[in-house]
Structure formats: C-alpha cells, structure tokens
Swiss-Prot record:
Subcellular location as annotated: Periplasm
Name of the protein in its database record: Glutaminase-asparaginase
InterPro entries recorded: AsnASE_II (IPR004550), Asp/glu_Ase-like_sf (IPR036152), Asparaginase/glutaminase-like (IPR006034), Asparaginase/glutaminase_AS1 (IPR020827), Asparaginase/glutaminase_AS2 (IPR027475), Asparaginase_C (IPR040919), L-asparaginase_C (IPR027473), L-asparaginase_N (IPR027474)
Domain Asparaginase/glutaminase span(s) in chain numbering: 35-362
Length: 362
C-alpha cells in the first residue's frame, strides 16, 4: 500500500468515528436551548376521525391518543422538547366540573416543575372557552398555558388541527407569552381565554373575541397586539389547590313568551346560583321577575347576562333594579363564562356584593 494511503487511512477512520458524536453533541445542545412543553390531551375533534376525507362535519371525536397527535406534527421537534399526557379522552360537551378540577390540578402540578416551560391542552371546541376561562381564574403561574382544538378531524381534507397544534406549541414556547393569562390559539390567532368564544360551529375561523385577538401566529412566530385587562392567573385570588369541589350553577334562557318554569325547576334541583341568559341587556321578562325575586330571597344567587352573539354588555341597574333585587350582573361575560366565574367565586363567598366585585374585576 502507498505510504501516503497508509498514513491517511487511520486519520479518516478517526474522523468518521468523531463525526457522529459531534453531531449528537450538537443535537443535545439544540434540545437544551428549546423550551420544554407538555401537551395534555383531553379528546375532542382535534383527536377525531371520520369515515373519509370528505367528512369534515360528521365524524367521531376523541379517537386518537396524544402520542398520535404529536407524531402527526413532526415539526414540533424543531420548536420545542415536547412530551404528552392523556388526561382524559372525551368530547368536550361531556366535560364535567370534576373533569375541570382534575385538569386544573394537573396543570398546576406541571406548572410548578422546573423542567416545564409551557403547557398546551388539546380540547374539544364545544366547551373549550369554558375550560380556558376556568384555568385563567385558578392557575397561579405566569408560565404559558395554551388551549387548542380544531374544527375538522385530522382525517378530513384541509384539516386545521395540525397547524393549530403547531401554533399552540410555538406560543407556549415563546417567553413573550408569559404573564398573559391562559391563551387560545385557533386559526392563526392568539385569543384571551377569558374573552374568546365559539361564534361559528362549522367554519375553521370559529373562535372570536368581542374585543379582538391578543395576537397572531405566523410560521411559528408570535405577534402581539394587546394585553389582558382583567385579573387572571398569578393575579387571581383563586387557587386550584384550594378548590376541592364546585357549587352547582345553572343557566336559564330568556326568550319571547318565556315562563318561570325552568328557573324554579333548576333551583329545586339544587342550583346555588342561576345565570339568566337574557335578551339584549340581560333583560328579564315581567313573567319571570317575581320568581327570580323570590328565589333570591330563598338564597339563590341571580346573575343577569346577555345571550347576544358578540359583545353582550350588561349594565347594572339598567333594565332591572339590581340593587333593589340584590342581583348580580355578568358585565361582558356570556352566560357560559358567567357560570364558570360564579362557580369559582362561590367557593369563597356567598355575598352578592362580593360576587359583583368579582364580576367587575375578572
């Protein structure tokens, strides 16, 4: 063998042996720089499957586990160190108060961990806004918590779940997301968990906030427009660790020719508070007012809200003499969010004046 080749061969071999370990070291260094994000899966459409790609509205929710969701978006590895947990596997219309508590306590445990930088929760869209607001009230952390879902199952043509999940992890990984309360990422927008609601039930641009989004996500980068104005998370007086159960709060709907039957039945069935989902400015029919006055005298809290689609804003002592009736107004919260705040608030107080303060501040 040529002497030069004899000299080169061992050197080349040594280089080949060194390269893989150098690549591994570089990969490890990259992973150390990435945020650590935990994805908590609860089911919903984002984990759903249809019979064919043409089925975007008819499908079975809560079919895929968290590992398959993560595997379906391999690009997640480029923006975060991701691991998943299956907390539950249900369609979100079936989520109970006990499920809220279970999820909330697991989020709190993870938020305390030094090796967790952000948390993403995959969720069905039907009650996503309720869960997001609940967590916004009770999680004592400034770490990013992002709730995400999809309007189409992953088996559908032009499914939105993969990009929504990618955006959620990107937002949860972003240090700028800290201290902004619980967030919702859908359709490239970053929404406040307090403000956002499902406004459309069939389109991908389904989630809207009456006061506009907090920001947007474009190719994994967050762009922020505003901050939350109400108390939340670290500034909240509520703590999931101190809540073991939630009181029964129900919603009754106001409409033309309404009677007081539903209100009385809900109270007889154990409701500690009733959310009146009223027309317009939380208006109450003259056929219902006497029953609500009587229920309040018997200890049931009466909270007026509005069921208008966007931007309901209930003014105190407008339409009804709330001071005289000892009722509470929900301010700009829709009925379902008013129910969430009432439940959480009533773990601390039964006083209507205190409840009204809480509704102003949260």
């Amino acid at each position: 063998m040529n002497a030069a080749l004899k000299t080169f061969a061992p050197s080349a071999l040594a280089l080949l042996l060194i390269l893989p370990s150098s690549a591994s070291a570089k990969e490890a260094e990259t992973q150390q720089k990435l945020a650590n994000v935990v994805i908590l899966a609860t089911g919903g459409t984002i984990a759903g499957a249809g019979a064919s790609a043409a089925n975007s509205a008819t499908y079975q929710a809560a079919k895929l586990g968290v590992d398959k969701l993560i595997a379906g978006v391999p690009e997640l590895a480029d923006i975060a160190n991701v691991r998943g947990e299956q907390v539950m596997q249900i369609a979100s219309e079936s989520i109970s108060n006990d499920d809220l508590l279970k999820l909330g306590k697991r989020v709190a445990e993870l938020a305390e961990s030094k090796d967790v930088d952000g948390i993403v929760i995959t969720h069905g869209t039907d009650t996503l806004e309720e869960t997001a607001f609940f967590l916004n009230l009770v999680e004592k952390t400034d770490k990013p918590i992002v709730v995400v879902g999809s309007m189409r199952p992953g088996t559908a043509m032009s499914a939105d779940g993969m990009l929504n999940l990618y955006n959620a992890v990107a937002v949860a990984s972003d240090k700028q997301s800290r201290g902004k309360g619980v967030l919702v990422t859908m359709n490239d927008e970053i929404q406040s968990g307090r403000d956002v609601s499902k406004a459309v039930n069939i389109k991908t641009e389904a989630f809207k906030s009456a006061w506009g989004p907090m920001g947007m996500v474009v190719e994994g980068k967050s762009y922020w427009f505003r901050l939350p104005a109400k108390r939340h998370t670290v500034n909240s007086e509520f703590d999931i660790k101190q809540i073991s159960s939630l009181p029964q709060v129900d919603i009754a709907y106001g409409y033309g020719n309404v009677t007081d039957t539903a209100y009385k039945a809900l109270a007889q069935n154990g409701a500690k508070a009733l959310i009146h989902a009223g027309t317009g400015n939380g208006s109450v029919s003259s056929r219902v007012v006497p029953a609500l006055q009587e229920l309040r005298k018997n200890g049931v809290q009466i909270i007026r809200s509005s069921h208008v689609n966007q931007g309901g804003f209930v003014l105190r002592n407008a339409e009804q003499p709330d001071d005289k009736n000892d009722w509470v107004v929900a301010h700009d919260l829709n009925p379902q969010k008013a129910r969430i705040l009432a439940m959480v608030a009533m773990t601390k107080t039964q006083d209507s004046k205190e409840l009204q303060r809480i509704f102003w501040e949260y």
